[in-house]
Structure formats: structure tokens, C-alpha cells
């Protein structure tokens, strides 16, 4: 809403009509002071009788209609969905929602008026100067008066930063605003000798990262001078990184002893600086010149723009003030405020000259020359001289690298030699010390449109411009110049999503000449490699795999068909061999036909392990021709032609590279898993193959359902590869109980309770058909009880008693049947698994020795079993080293995951405890035994929560076969399924339901809209083209939830909030809670609540101690909020954890908390922090693993994110407000009965209603009840008649489990929908959500103030979400709005 048109009232004649926008005025003259008739409470000129003079103020005290009485008409209950059959309440008193009054103190009113007045005046001034409107106007900061040049008086000069004006047609989005580049960062970079325009370009390319921008400029500068000399020598390739790091550490100690405090290691093994005192340079350039020059500049130039200094001037090149930072502001504290750890000083000691040594990650110094930079604060030293000194020093470093000698001390000595350096001072010109040459406009036919929200790509001036492919963006020249510096150097990146997204918007094509040269080199190396003994030895092993026999068939089909489906059993070699068949075939051909292959994997560990395996088979290290890329990590180089990546990484690339330019083959592995991402990728690829006839797609499945995929791609050909495995004996639960002689003890947690047995019997009776009921009654009446009695196969085992189980399992011992009859089949029995492991390790059987693979549902079960085995002397290795135990889970580090592939010493049994990650994604060769718990975590839609959740479910028959196939790789194997044979044959599904049909679709909707190819399509039309579309009702519900959250517009367009939620792989409501927690600086508590919502509540309630557990929970309660009670409990746990593990255990036991749930929440908090860091909402570079390592007890998030992100972490009212924004529209109205009164000696007193008399109603579901586990269960009075909830549970009645009271201001300021103000019976009613939520404003002024403040807040949140790097603390407009919101929520 434009601030310049907020008031439509006219100061004129009276009798105007009241409206939510103000009164309709009369025809009074604007240039006179006659008062208008006002009308119904108009704004300018006021309302009322018309006797007051018109005022130019926005609000006046006389406009305040003080209406404190509530309207007499009772509020209308919103129960439109009440079913006809619902019984009326038994009590007679009518219940109603108390209509609360929206108050605001006079002090707060004045402050809000002053704030809005300032904001609107600035907006009006900005609008009149600019003459534009819309999003561009809203997103710009507010500036002071007379900031821009008067119309027609603008000075004529070229704009500072305009290269993007030459890229693309007019509809391309406006350039990155100047606030994206800090003037302090530009000034800092320029002191290395680079011109400010080069600095600005580099900073934009590197997303404001000062260290990365410096390295980018240095490489660009040095590559033009030294070219191929910068290449890594062949000797350095084979040197280990550990050896290089050790030598650097030794040199560090030597430099510290020689240079003392002048030497500083800014970043360990990355950045060194040495302060220098070069008096001869200071004396050579007289300081008087500087003073004279600066004086002339001050006399002739306009003063510096104050908004530019703050980092954001909306007028840009039209501003009449100077966009430069004065030299006096660049020293001291201001200079150190540049937020870059690579360059910041650790203390206040400064030197006029500094030598900086920089090492990239995995740098091979001293076998490889480091980047060398000469830095000076001497403003009289010419920029060109600084660069010539840096080049001279780098040349010396290259010479030392040939002999692998340390170079830093030698460089210091060279700088102190006046005779050597003075020679360089005669060179006063350098290409990078002057502005770059203007880039010519791109011809219109080669311009390429950009997708929505795409950041502009800044071109670079390089020498490759004449070698570009047609249609390639100019920005690629810069990247290719870097790539052509030498042979393929492996780049290991921890790349954030922000940087990945920015890079993805550049074309992936490379210059034809550069690509041909690189391919020629790769072909030559491959031909040489084929002659080596090592390669031949590995090739012979590869030829033993079943996939090798189909090599010619596969290549022949690919030469004729664009899409091929390959079905192969686990272990046939399809994942490792088929990509190599394609690559090797292309390497034996001409260089211009070399393949560029991407192979997707469903999990991170798969991408890493397979890439390392394939690289080993090719007798090279990973990162050369074979690399991998996962979220936040990539190991690849310019020579990589086979890239293994996760499905999500490829989908992210598609956001900026819609047709996968430069890619020749896409291989989608494990398509049979039918994940949401893989099904969506198939839809995208089906579109791309229609556009790119040269792109080939190979789908690989480990099951025999390949026909479905073949049909989806127009009946493309299918190849079936047989598996290679030894016979595997398959056993079930009854067999496991027999061999281990396991017996359930009384009171065992794995025993079914009597209540559960009764429940199962009741369930079985309900599930019977009418015919089965008749048959059962007839059997009982005729006493048909013979030996041949049978039990129907449709009845599950858990619904049978001992006698029925005897009938079903003939030949099984009674002791086993007795155990089965009382066992809880829904639980994973860790005791039985331990007993099986003892049987296997003891070796009292005929099976050969080998590794054991145990499949468990999730990380919690893995931890429990691991700890349980550690208390068993057979497994803990305290007496003898008989076993080694490895957990395997996707959240573990790469090093921990790789340990499972290491073969143990002779006589030691390797036990791997894994989730279904080991089912198809990876192959562990030495596994002989498999224990299948029969359970897995599966994403499901939780109707109670209205969101996605991970639930324990039984595996399918296909899953069970895959798990069985993991055994028998090297010898005859054994597989124990911990479910019965009957359950396997009659209860398990043949295939799991595709994920897309059982999960909420909000995330996929957002992902579809973020892709350029689907951004303008109707969601229904896109979903209908999926291989197996979800139900239309599921899509409809997801669209409603997205609109309620503000992520999607009614016409299905993505909002800025939706854009960022699409980048967070979490439920959209949790994502919104995380974002708002970051914006309002209460991050840590917001993440704690988000982790609980995403996982589960840590409060536990044992059957025999329910009352005691509820009382303990009430001790944490305050502000009528389950979420704030959770927050208190979690804080207490963190404090106890910092004391000791024992204290943590006692705290959980005493307060009925689950320690494992709290640990899972802590892990989730760290993951959420990483995600926010990844998209730029908290400081970049935060990684969950690093946070966990640095945490000294607790989760470590508060310390990692810093005080700035948690300024309001102790403000419970603000936390509730942020929660309101995330959970809305999950609001419950509290209806209270009409008052009862009691006579007393002092008069009549109103009685509090009983808790049972309160009624709770939702907008869509009618009446609900508060769950007994909630802290609000027995509450008799709520200060506010509105509660927020997260989850509904339907049993005999509909319950809301956790809820939190929310007051007036959070609802008005953060609730969904538009705020409406209406005059009803003399009172101004503020309403939300079509009148579902209503308040009475204390006055018209209060109503309008709140409404206008809500508009400003909405706009500010949009600006922040559009630009996550915007600092609301330093932004004058943002900080004032946030402060006012916090004050109103806290004090009113």
C-alpha cells in the first residue's frame, strides 16, 4: 500500500459517511483554513461537526472517539460447519466470545503517530521525486528530504554500475541495489590496488564476500600475467594434504618467532598477514600531496550522501550527493566494521603496509604458490604500484613452488629491499587499477530472458569475449578465465544455497575453444591410463559384474533412443558401471563428443560413496573426471565429466538452468523408491527431452516395476540385468524366537498391555464383515471346535490369542507361540536383536563368518541399540576385541559413514546398525547376516497437525526383498525378518505407496512455482502430468494452507515469503516460524518451538503416573501456553546438560521429560540454524556439525547465532506473537457462559465459570476440546478469548493437544488476512478473517493507528524477505517499526 495515498478524506463540508478508510469529506478549499464537516471520522480534516479547522496533521487529538463500552449485540457464533446430528450442549446458559477492547496508551499513540507521520512523509517525498510506484518503490529505503536532484537539473555523467543494463530485454528485473555492496568493503579492496569499479563487480559476483572477492580479483589479475605457470605441478598432485598442512604449521611457528606480533594467522591454514614498516615508501610519497588533493576535492565536490554511507541510497546515480566514503571515516573503528573474518584485525595494532598470504581449501603449499597480496593504507601510494608489487611477489612464489620451499620469509626480505621495490614504482599504469572498459551491448537476438527472482549477472571484462558460444552470458568469461588457469584443480566447496543459487543463474555452457582443449586433454589422459597395470587390474574386476555383459546392448540402445529404463537387482553394478560405459565410450571418440553426465542419487551418502568407488575404479582421485555434489559440499573440477549428486541438487540447478545446457546424459538412479523429489524430477525431464533432442535420460531401478517408467516415457526400451548373489536363507520372527530361545519377561516394554489386547480384539470384531459375523455366531452356537479349525488370513497376528496362533503356526513350539501371543508387534524389539547378534557372534551355527547389517527405523533406535550393546561384554570389547560396531545414518559425517566399508581384522565381527539408507543406496560387500526390524520411517500427512510427519511404518515386500539381498554378496547369507511369515505374505504391501500420494504438497507447490518452466502454469495442470498424480483434494488443501500463510497469492503466484519457504526443506509453517524468529531477533526460542513442532513434545506421561506427570508440566506453565512451558523445560534441560550427563538424566526423570526427544530437538535446532544460514537469514557459514562440536553442553545454537539474533529471546509476549504468525489460522475461540453473580456483604460479585462450562470453537471444524495433557485443561479464565493450536486429535471427540493463549495485538499485527475497521452501533470494530476475529477499538484513532502500523509491518517484512541481508537494526525505518511493534506487544 503506497504511503502517499493513505488518506482519501477531504476537508470540506460535513455529513460525510464513515468508512474504514476515513470519512468522506466535502468541497472545502484546500488553501483556506475553514474546517470541514468531517464526516464519519475522516482522517485529514477530521470528522465530526465540521467546526474545527482543517489540519495538515495526520491524526489529531480531537479525532479520538473514546468508545469503551462494548456493543450490546452479542457476537455471532461462527459455527457454519456444524453437522445436523450434533447434539446441543446440555447447559442452558448461552456462551459467547467476550469482545475485547483494543487499548493504546496516550504515550504509545503519540509515538506511533510520530512514526507513521515520518514514514508517510518520506514515502510521499520519495514518490514525488521518483514518480514510480509498486514493488520497486516499496522495497527501497526511506530517505531524507531534498536527497535527489531537482527535475531537469541532474548532472550528466555515466552511472557507476551499469553493466547489467546491456544484458537482456527491458523486462529483466532491476539491478541489485547499491546496498548489496558495502562502501567499506569497496574501500578495503581498493587498498590492494584495484579500482573501485573492479571491486564493486567482484563483490557483487561474490555476494558481498570480501575475502572471496579479493581472491577472485587476484586470480583474474595473475592469470593474465602468468597464465599456465599457475598450474599445479604433477609432483604436487600426488602430495598428501596432511603433509602440506604439517609443513605450513612448522612455517607458522618459525614466522611467529621471527616476526613476533607482526605475524597474525587470521584464519587457520587459510590467511596469514605480516605487518611491515617500509619507511622508504612512506618517505617517497609526500603526505602534503594528499592533504592538498583532499582539500581540492572537498572544495569542489558535493558532500557525501548519508544514506550511501548507511548502505542503501534509492536515488543511485541520480543522487546529487557523493557516493564515496570520506577517507577520515575509513580508518579506526569504521574500517574494522567490515564483516569479513579473512580481513579483520584481531586487535588494534595497525600497519601502513601489510603482506597477505592466502591459501584456498586443500591448497598444496609449499608445493603450490599461495595467493600473495600487498596492502597499504598510504593513500599516496598509486594503486598500480601496489598491484605491480603483488605480481612481483607472486612471481617469486611461483619460482619457490618449483622447489617446494617455504616462501613467506623470502617475500618479507624482498619487500624490505628498497632497490628491488623502487624499480616497480616507475610503473604507474595497470589494467586493474583503472576502470574496466565498457562492455558493448549484446545483440538482441542473443539476449536471454531470466526467471522470476533471478539476480542479475554482472559481466566481466576478459580476453575470451570472442570465443563465447552463441547466447552465452558475458559473466561466464570471468569463470572461464579462472578455469583456464591450468589443469583441472579439484575444488572442494562448502557452498551455501545463496551462492549456489546465484551461480545457477549463469549458463553452464563454456567457450567452445576452452571446452575442446579440456576434452582433448581428458581423452589423452584416458588413453594413457588404459595402458597402466593398475587400470587393467581394476578393469578385470569390473568385467566380472553382471552389468558388463549388457554393456554393448546398453550403448546400442542409447545410440537409437533418447530415454532408456534399466532394471537391475542390487549388486549387479548398474550404479557404478553404466555411467562409466557411457563416459568411456565418449572418451574413445572425438573431443567434441565427450559426454557430460549427471547421475542423481536419493541420499548424500550414496553420492559420496559411489563417486569415490568409481574414481577408484578409474585409478584417480575423486574430483577429477569423477566428482560429487551434495548440499553444502561439492568436490569437482573443470575436468569433471561424471558428477554424482543428490536429486535436490539437480532440482536446484534447474531453477537457474532450465534446459541443463552442456549436459549430455542424466541418469536417475533408484527411481523405484518413488520419492517426492524423484517423481517430480521425472516430470521435469519429460519436458526437457521435448526441448533438447541431444539430452539422453537413463532411469535405473532396483526392482522389476520398470514397465511403469517405460510407459511414462512413451514406452521407451527396458533392459533387465540379473543380480549376482549367493543363496540367502530367509527366516521370520517365529524362527528368530526359536534359535535364540528368547522369552519375554513380565513387565517388559515389548509386551502388550491388557488394555492393548482388548483394543485389538475390539478392532478385529469391528473389521469383520456381516458374513464373517454370522459364521462366527453359528460356529459358537454349534460348538464347532474340531482339530481342523482355521483362522482367516485377513486377521493380523496381533489380534489372535494363543490358541488361534497355534492353529495358524502349525509345527511351531508352544514356547514360541506363547511369546508371540504377548509380544507387541508394533514395537522394534531391541532385546531380540541383541539375542540374535549374540547367536551370530558366538558362531554356534553352520554359516560362515561375515559382517552383520541391522536395519532399524531411525537414529533414536540406532542410539538405543548402540548403547544397549555397549553394556554387553560380548560387544563392548572390554575383555576381548570380538566386535566393531558402526552406526549408519544420513545425519552422520562423511568420515563416520565411510567407516562401514572398512573390512575388520580376522576374527572380528563388523556390526552395522543402519536405517534404510543401506537398503539400496550403498553396497557393503562383506555382509553375510541381515537383521530386518521390519520398520522404517516414512513421510506421511498427519491430518491432526495438518502437516508432514515422519512415522514408523512396516516395510513393503519389495523393501524386505531388498534388505534380504544385502546378504549373500560374498558367501551364503542369512536374513532374519522380525515379523512373522504370515505378516509377510498377507499383511505387507507389495510396494510402498508413492511418497507424493501420502505427504502434504506445500513444498512441492512452491518448488514448482520457483522453476521458470512452470512459473506461469496452473498447479493442477502440472500435478496432473506426474507419473502417479496425488488426489485433487490434497492439492486443494495445500493451496489453501499456502495462501493462509502468505506464501502463495490467490492467482497462484509465489510471494517473497513463498520464495524463501521453497528454499527450506521443512513444513511451511515451521519455516515461517524460523524466518520470523530470525527477523524479530528471538531466534533461539523460535527454533526450540519449531524443533518440537517438527518432531514431538518432550513431555512424557506414563500410564501409572499421569497425574504426577501433568502436575510437573504445570510447574513449567505460564501465560497459558504449552509452547512457553516447553521452552522453560528445554532451558532447564540445557542448564542441567552443561553440568553433567548425570544431572541431565536426573532432570529428565524428575520432570517426566524424554531425554532422547530433547536430544533430537537439539539436533533439529542445529539443522534449522544451518538452513537459515544457508539462505542468508543468519550469519553465513554456520554448520550443524560445527555448532555441535563447539557446544559445551546444550545445543550450542544461542552461542553460534550470537546476541544480535537473540536480543528478544527472553520476551515471552513477542515469542507468542511470532508463534501466532506461524500457526495462524489455527485459532480457537473461547466462549464463556453468561455471567453468574453471588451476593456478598460488600455487594454483588461475578463468579468465575467452571472450566467445563467454557466452550472452544474453530472456524472450520466447529466445537473442540482441550486435551487433558495441556496446561490449559483446567483453566477457568483466559485473559484473551483466543487460543493458538498446532495439532488436532480425533478420538471419541476432537481435541487440540497443545495450545497457547494469544492476546489482542499479536492477532491484529500478525494474523492473516486484511485488517478491517467498521463503525457498528457507535463502536469501532477491528476485524480479521471475514469477522472471525473481532475487537472493539478504544477509539477510532487507535483503530486507524493499528491498521496503518500493520500495513507498515507487512511492507517491512516483505522487504526483509526479499532481501535477507537487510539489517533491520541499522536500517532506520526497519528498526523503528520493529521497536514499536515489540513495545506494543510487550506493554499493552
Swiss-Prot record:
Region entry Disordered, spans: 1-107, 121-154
Keywords of the record: ATP-binding, Coiled coil, Helicase, Hydrolase, Metal-binding, Nucleotide-binding, Phosphoprotein, Zinc, Zinc-finger
Name this polypeptide is given: Putative ATP-dependent RNA helicase DHX57
Residue positions of motif DEVH box: 669-672
Helicase ATP-binding domain span: 555-722
Keyword tRNA-binding recorded: no
Annotated PROSITE patterns: HELICASE_ATP_BIND_1 (PS51192), HELICASE_CTER (PS51194), UBA (PS50030), ZF_C3H1 (PS50103)
Bias kind Basic residues: ranges: 1-11
InterPro entries according to UniProt: DEAD-box_helicase_OB_fold, DEAD/DEAH_box_helicase_dom, DHX57_UBA, HA2_WH, Helicase-assoc_dom, Helicase_ATP-bd, Helicase_C-like, P-loop_NTPase
The Helicase C-terminal domain, residue ranges: 832-1012
